[in-house]
Design a protein with these regions (language model features):
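Conserved phosphate-interacting/catalytic interface
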Residues: 1
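Metal-dependent amide/peptide-bond hydrolase catalytic core
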Residues: 4-232
Length: 232
């Protein structure tokens, strides 16, 4: 008996699209099995939901981030980041600035123009509530459909550094990354503190979340029949 395995990861901007594509892929597999007089079994591996933004909470987090501002970089950090930038292409830098421009509205475009030669971020990028899809991984997609969630970006590497590269890994244990993560931690802590202090803000976040989920209820993307599989 000959057995062949194939693993497919299906992604789309919305979960409804993912489900439609998954159903179609399953039918294609079933059709191929019929044509070749073989059998097929679809084994569900994993799934996660898209991120649901909460604009009220995002604004609160942005105010906290703006209060702290970007880290103070010393000469050694700037010199090292400049060495990293020297290994990047012009497209790498431009793609990084384009992402900022796409998520910051008109102010984001102006910010990108101002920082074409910046080595390490020295100004908080503008915030704008946009519907642009950011293709990135997150662990809080499903959580965001159960309660209000906000996310922020923090400067942990030289401007223009592409993700999943040796350049990013090289900066991961530097003081640059440590300062960036400390800023993120302070921002999250301050945002949480403000929610404890301002019950009205918390209520606004909850009301916004309720309004969205009333029309788009959460459905766990993992079928109920699926159980944890043995470790391989």
């Amino acid at each position: 008996m000959c057995i062949r395995d194939r693993l497919y990861l299906i992604r789309a901007p919305e979960m409804t699209d993912v489900q439609h594509i998954y159903d179609r892929v399953a039918k294609i597999a079933e059709g191929a099995a019929l044509m070749t007089e073989t059998t097929v079994e679809c084994r569900f591996d994993k799934a996660c939901s898209s991120y649901l933004p909460n604009r009220t909470l995002e604004n609160a987090m942005y105010r906290a981030l703006s209060h702290f501002g970007t880290p103070e970089w010393n000469s050694e950090e700037l010199a090292f980041a400049k060495q990293i930038q020297a290994t990047l292409t012009s497209n790498d830098r431009q793609n990084s600035l384009n992402n900022i421009a796409a998520t910051g509205g008109e102010n984001g475009k102006a910010y990108a123009l101002r920082h074409r030669e910046t080595v390490l971020a020295n100004e908080v990028a503008p915030y704008a509530a946009t519907e642009n899809v950011l293709a990135a991984s997150t662990d809080v997609g499903d959580v965001s459909w159960k309660l209000p969630v906000a996310q922020c970006f923090s400067p942990c590497f030289a401007v223009g550094t592409p993700l999943h590269t040796w350049q990013l890994v090289s900066q991961g244990r530097t003081s640059i990354a440590h300062k960036g993560m400390l800023l993120a931690a302070k921002t999250m802590a301050a945002t949480t503190l403000n929610l404890f202090i301002d019950s009205g803000l918390l209520q606004e976040c909850q009301q916004e979340h309720q309004q969205v989920t009333d029309t788009q209820p959460y459905h766990c993307p993992i079928p109920k029949k699926v159980t944890p599989s043995p470790l391989k």
